[in-house]
Amino acid sequence: MDPKISYFQTFIVASKTKSFSKAAKRLGITQGTVSNHISALEKYFDAQLFLRTPEGVDLTPEGKIFYERAEKILDLLNEAKLLMRAIHENPEGIIRIYASTTPGEHILPSIIKEYKSSYKNVDFEITITDSERCFKALDEGLADIAAVGYLKNKNYEYTIIGKDRLVLIVPPNHPLAEKGTAKLEDILKEDYIDREEGSGTREAFIKALNDKGYSIMDLNVVMRLGSHSAVITAVSEGYGVSVVSEIPAKKAEDAGLIKIVPVVDLDVVRYLYLVKSRRPKNPSAVKSFWEFVTKV
């Protein structure tokens, strides 16, 4: 069996004190344990390390060879420990994040800005895609963290970073905008701008439809687009209506591009999540960022 680090420490102290009993007292262990540690080392190296004397113990020639190297080994281990601690306290490198549109464009930037005010040597590489591809990137080792609009399953380590409401958006001059409210059946009558498959927004809306006894097939989908901004542009230009995240929708409404219309019989609220890879490429930086986010 390979020797433990504690055996090296016992050997060094016994060498310096020239006594197993003094070594035991200094280390807070029994003299028998000291003897066992030394015996294990002697067995491993197939060499006698100490000579027993009336006064205590002295190093053999083999023991002197090992003493010099054991001290270096312990010094290197302590140095490595200090360097690792420094990395944990001052992480550096890149954290790779795959993010769906809403958390990636509207939630993460402020979190990252606050984090980087304390950890300037950590940089972020963010890829915006749909939630399904975010999970795939995690599983394939392409992402250290994913920011998504739904949980694929509960086997991932995750934390909630926000809450989002889905809202109906229509062109500014649309009859529903003038009416001021809508019902789910009104959406079913309109040309609908859908998000791409794998979108967290789309998944949440489909679930809401299913809960009401409908399906995606009941919508008159005229096009599918890959981001909220593309959907908002299509709606503003009169191609149809859509259900999107309230966060970008409010910005677009303030800019006069679309109108948000409350749907009296539909209330879709979802959580936004950060999900951590089981095998991050930069463990220290990811650990630091994760602890920062979960403590906020």
From Swiss-Prot:
Gene Ontology MF term list: DNA-binding transcription factor activity; transcription cis-regulatory region binding
DNA-binding region: 20-39
Annotated S-S bridges: none
Domain of life: Archaea
Gene3D superfamilies hit by this protein: 3.40.190.290, Winged helix-like DNA-binding domain superfamily/Winged helix DNA-binding domain
Any Pfam family hit: HTH_1
PROSITE patterns per record: HTH_LYSR
Keywords recorded for this protein, A-Z: DNA-binding, Transcription, Transcription regulation
Domain HTH lysR-type: 1-60
Biological process terms in GO annotation: regulation of DNA-templated transcription
Entry similarity comment: Belongs to the LysR transcriptional regulatory family.
Database matches in PANTHER family: HTH-TYPE TRANSCRIPTIONAL REGULATOR (PTHR30126), HTH-TYPE TRANSCRIPTIONAL REGULATOR GLTR (PTHR30126:SF40)
UniProt name for this protein: Uncharacterized HTH-type transcriptional regulator MJ0300
Organism: Methanocaldococcus jannaschii (strain ATCC 43067 / DSM 2661 / JAL-1 / JCM 10045 / NBRC 100440) (Methanococcus jannaschii)
